[in-house]
């Protein structure tokens, strides 16, 4: 069966839901899907139920559904790909890759609870991984009858956003009830439409880096019987046409191959554009030749490196960081794009130790090469938790 072609008629925006566990991220995602499918019916606005969205991250990862917990929908203005980032601490790694894919995010805060630990953690992570815009869905608003409480929660969330470098004063805060909207309640359906209007208006059309050389970090790799190996990820920049030659850079020696097919939301494309989640079919490449953490690039545009100077912020104990200082030769993991690589930190002369809460210049020696450019962001992690975040300032070798 020939696949339907993906039509590009509206601006495409990647968004997602973030926030504390059980505050209703997935319910709200399902509600957006339902309300839009009823009020703006189209080929794109197909209702996705809660269970399908909720089970996406784990179960379907090994199937051939490209784009794991992404759903697509459209407003009158735009086409959206929406990723539902699960809320548990052990999903933080997914959150880092998921959040890195967002042009903006809906921070879901239950009006019944207010901001909680993971609310703060997700806002901090959103800032670190460069989610440029947030807006707030004050969820479960049907369960709070006291206007003062709603106002207090709103103030608290605005303050939290301001403290983390977002524009807390001007961020839209929309009162919603994902559950009631999902049940078909007219009033709360209107609230979901109001939320989507706020998303349309407060998250600017992303400036896509289409003119730069193509780069896509690999998130997943699988085999499609009879066709070959597919790598999936979000194109960070550039445009890639079918039958183009590419290089796969990082972790292993650089290899050349040809992209023989491109698909997105199970539809065939002639080209992959910056900002799109897609799967690339690679000619003559075996499943074991490529892995998560490598990047697919225009030949000659990016090189692998192991040693760099970076600027990093080390999280304080209160932010969930380390409780004690570290010294030269500290060996954490450096999380670049989609993978962790161990690296050895050397502190600048005259700096004996680094305290939680410090901002510091470091030299890092990675045990495996990573496709790297100046300005590339990374997280510093240890034992599965983020203890710092930084940027590559200068490549040394």
From Swiss-Prot:
Mg(2+) binds at residue 26. GTP binds at residues 19-26, 84-88, 139-142. Transmembrane segments: none annotated. Residues 19-26 are annotated as: G1. One of its GO terms (molecular function) is GTP binding. PROSITE patterns: G_TR_1 (PS00301), G_TR_2 (PS51722). Residues 177-179 are annotated as: G5. Residues 84-87 are annotated as: G3. Monomer. GTP hydrolase that promotes the GTP-dependent binding of aminoacyl-tRNA to the A-site of ribosomes during protein biosynthesis. This is Elongation factor Tu. The gene is tuf.
